[in-house]
């Protein structure tokens, strides 16, 4: 789904339902940089996983991310699940606080493993929210 402001595309999100039970994956066959996310996805089996949410920089701070988050929660609920999950890097403080203020709680975390060319540090955090 997308967010619009004055008929302009300004943001979007996408996600999917995580299989339950989670499929068996040989982590040794997976590049190391992907392992933390796969391990956390396994913890989120049965959830609807918000894989990405983004707002163009010039439109941030206007409540659009919260609106998109609400739409994602509706999509998750309509899919038949009672929980929405997401992964966020702990260094992304703005996103982390936005999720917390919208009822998401930390469930698990894994140390971030660098992608080639990345200098990110810290943990990847799995958060989720119960949907009523």
Regions found by a protein language model. Name each.
Residues 17-52:
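Conserved acyl-donor/pantetheine-binding loop and adjacent beta-alpha core of acyl/acetyltransferases
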Residues 46-48, 60, 69, 76-87:
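Conserved GNAT acetyl-CoA-binding A-motif
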């Amino acid at each position: 789904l997308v967010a619009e402001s004055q008929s302009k595309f300004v943001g979007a999100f996408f996600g999917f339902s995580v299989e339950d039970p989670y499929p068996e994956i040989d982590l040794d066959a997976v590049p190391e940089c992907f392992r933390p996310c796969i391990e956390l996805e396994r913890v989120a089996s049965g959830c609807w996983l918000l894989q990405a949410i983004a707002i163009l920089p010039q439109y941030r701070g206007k409540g659009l991310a919260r609106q998109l988050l609400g739409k994602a929660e509706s999509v998750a609920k309509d899919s038949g699940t009672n929980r929405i999950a997401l992964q966020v890097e702990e260094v992304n403080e703005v996103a982390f606080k936005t999720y917390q203020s919208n009822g998401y709680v930390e469930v698990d975390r894994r140390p971030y493993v660098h992608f080639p060319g990345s200098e990110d540090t810290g943990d990847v955090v799995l958060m989720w929210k119960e949907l009523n």
